[in-house]
Swiss-Prot record:
Organism for this UniProt entry: Staphylococcus aureus (strain NCTC 8325 / PS 47)
Protein name in UniProt: Probable cell wall hydrolase LytN
Predominant location: secreted
CDD domains, alphabetized: LysM
Its biological purpose: Probably involved in peptidoglycan hydrolysis.
């Protein structure tokens, strides 16, 4: 019984040992697996971290590359007038360097590489990655060329604007005047609405009293306005009228035959007076033709009678064909407002009463009514 008991105990102990051994094996296995997984996980994390570091470095370089491209594009799209030919973008682990010094020299094409240097702290060996960025090279080339063109256009634009401004807003304000006989600087200055000193300074004239015939002077580009004729004062006008009346008084009470034909005609008296003023007689088949047969542009002014017209002493009055048997009549005015109502005037006449052809009617004073068809000729000269 004892033996049996011991045998049974031995068997039970053996079974318990197997169980413990199995548990130990399982524990060791689990531990080994755990250690293996731990080791595997640690290596994976390290590799993954290292890979991330490398990826970060590369990504950082790529982002800098993109940033450089975008910056160039921004410059191209906005200013297009300045591109930095030398620049460096640096980080702690990555350097991105763009060298464009030779990009536009001698018109050579740009062939530029971007070098990214990657040297992780935990790596004993540096890895160099060279990227041939043709797209960025092309962008830089275009940007540089466009910058050159833009600068050239700006230069041309400024030049064109300058000449346009000169042509349209700063055009020369002077013209050339040729000095004529009798000219003086003061007279020229008056004619062109400027001053003698201004003409002197413009033409470098030291002595304002010394100019020469044919000399070219720069004068202001202003419309020529001739000086207004001096108005004759009432005193001067009275003196002129007095001198005319004094001369006409010498013709009164005498018979005049200017052409030697048909006696003392009205036309003869007027021709004597006009010859005294201008040295020649007047043309016309009859007295009524005088205003149309002669050129009075430089000698007199012609007036047609109106209700407000007033003749002056020395004016010629021409009657229409209603008088003188169709030939008209002419006389020399002495008083243009004889009645004070502008209804009558007084003149010096000859042959008014048809006695001149017989030389029986001398020049004498006659009062006439103003007629609608009368014409008056006022000489510029006074007797």
């Amino acid at each position: 019984m004892f033996v049996y008991y011991c045998k049974e105990c031995f068997i039970m102990n053996k079974q318990q040992s197997k169980v413990r051994y199995s548990i130990r094996k399982v524990s060791i296995g689990i531990l080994s697996i755990s250690i293996g997984m731990f080791l595997a996980l640690g290596m994976s994390n390290k590799a993954y971290a290292d890979e991330i570091d490398k990826s970060k470095d590369f990504t950082r370089g790529y982002e800098q590359n993109v940033f450089a491209k975008s910056e160039l594009n921004a410059n191209k799209n906005t200013t297009k007038d300045k591109i930095k030919n030398e620049g460096a973008v640096k980080t702690s682990d990555t350097s991105l360097k763009l060298d464009n010094k030779s990009a536009i020299s001698n018109g050579n094409e740009i062939n530029q590489d971007i070098k990214i240097s990657n040297t992780p702290k935990n790596s004993s060996q540096g890895n160099n990655l060279v990227i041939n960025n043709n797209e960025l090279t092309k962008e830089i080339k275009i940007a540089n060329l466009e910058a050159q063109n833009s600068n050239q256009k700006k230069t041309n634009k400024v030049t064109n604007n300058y000449f346009g401004y000169y042509s349209f807003r700063e055009a020369p304000k002077t013209q050339i005047y040729t000095v004529k006989k009798g000219d003086t600087l003061s007279a020229i200055a008056l004619k062109y609405k400027t001053t003698v000193s201004n003409i002197q300074n413009t033409n470098n004239i030291a002595n304002p009293n010394l100019i020469f015939i044919g000399q070219k002077l720069k004068v202001p580009m202003t419309p020529l306005v001739e000086p207004k004729p001096k108005t004759v004062s009432s005193n001067n006008k009275s003196n002129s009228n007095s001198s005319t009346l004094n001369y006409l008084k010498t013709l009164e009470n005498r018979g005049w035959d200017f052409d030697g034909s048909y006696g003392w005609q009205c036309f003869d008296l007027v021709n004597v007076y006009w010859n005294h003023l201008y040295g020649h007689g007047l043309k016309g088949y009859g007295a009524k033709d005088i205003p149309y047969a002669n050129n009075f542009n430089s000698e007199a002014k012609i007036y047609h009678n109106t209700p407000t017209f007033k003749a002056e002493p020395g004016d010629l009055v021409v009657f229409s064909g209603r008088f003188g048997g169709g030939y008209g009549h002419t006389a020399i005015v002495l008083n243009g407002d004889y009645d004070g109502k502008l209804m009558k005037f007084q003149s010096l006449d000859q042959n008014w009463n048809n006695g001149g052809w017989r030389k029986a009617e001398v020049a004498h004073k006659v009062v006439h009514n103003y007629e609608n068809d009368m014409i008056f000729i006022r000489p510029f000269k006074k007797a």
